[in-house]
Every structure is written in C-alpha cells, then in structure tokens.
Amino acid sequence: MNIGFKEDLTIEFKSDKNKLPDSDLVDAVVAFANTNGGDIYLGIEDDGEITGLHKSHQDITQLAAFIANKTVPPIAVRAEKSEDKQYLKISVPKSRSIVASSSGKIQRRRIKADGTPENVPMYPHEIASRLSDLSLLDYSSLCVPDAKYSDLDPVERERLRSIIRMNPQGEQN
C-alpha cells in the first residue's frame, strides 16, 4: 500500500520496520523546526510504501514527550496515528529560534539538485543568517571592528541627517 504523495521540504517519510533510531527521529524534528516546519510520517518508506510502526513507537504521548526532552529548546510536536494505525504523522512547528538536539546537533532541511529533500548540518556561519531570517539579529546593528569615522560616506551621512530633520518625531540635535 502506498501513501499517495511524495517527500518534499515539508514532508519526510521514515521507515520504522527495524525501529528508527531515536537519534534519527530527533535529528529530523530539529531539521524541520529549523526550516519551515512540516510533517514526518513514521512507518513509511522513501518510495511512499506503508510498512508499519515498530512496537516501541505505538504510544504517541510518550513519543511526543521524548522529542520534547531531546530538543533544545523543547519542541512540542503533535503526533497522530493513521486510521488503520499503520503509520504515525508527527507535525513539527517552525521554531522562532534555533533548535538543537540535546546532544548539540543542529540540522536544517534543503532540497538537493535532484529535487529530493535532505537534512544537513547547520554550520556556525549559517546561524547568523538564520537568526536574521527570524528577525532576531539586525546586521546593521553589529559593530565593525577597526572602523573609523572616515570610512563612512559623507554623502550618506548628510542624507541620513536630512531624513532625521524631516521627521517631526525625531530628535533635532
């Protein structure tokens, strides 16, 4: 039996025939939370074939609690079994901060050249960009080491002064 749709940036299938390792599930949740959120279908192969849940993943309350305990900050997922109880849909919200696994692993999702999704590490240089996307970091407010007054464009300084003067709510100094 096939689920009838494919994986994309917000949908991931995870096989659970031989019990998906807990770390793989947590990494997938972290990647979704650090991208746009989405749904993880546990008990479904990459080709969409429904192969069923392992007995250790039958308790959805326990699974949701486990995920919250293994993510930093804790991610509250919503887990629901299919009507035939053969697979689990785990809905992961988009996080308003950067999320890591409790072991310190930070992941994100992306689309490969062939159009299929994958989870990849989020490297330190990508963290500032992600924080900016979340409106948590303003690059213009960062200090520039060794900058001097003479580095600033005098025309732009005068343009800024003019804008400030025209704003009746702004300071006049």
Feature roles, as predicted:
Residues 1-173:
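Conserved N-terminal catalytic/coupling substructures associated with nucleotide/phosphate chemistry
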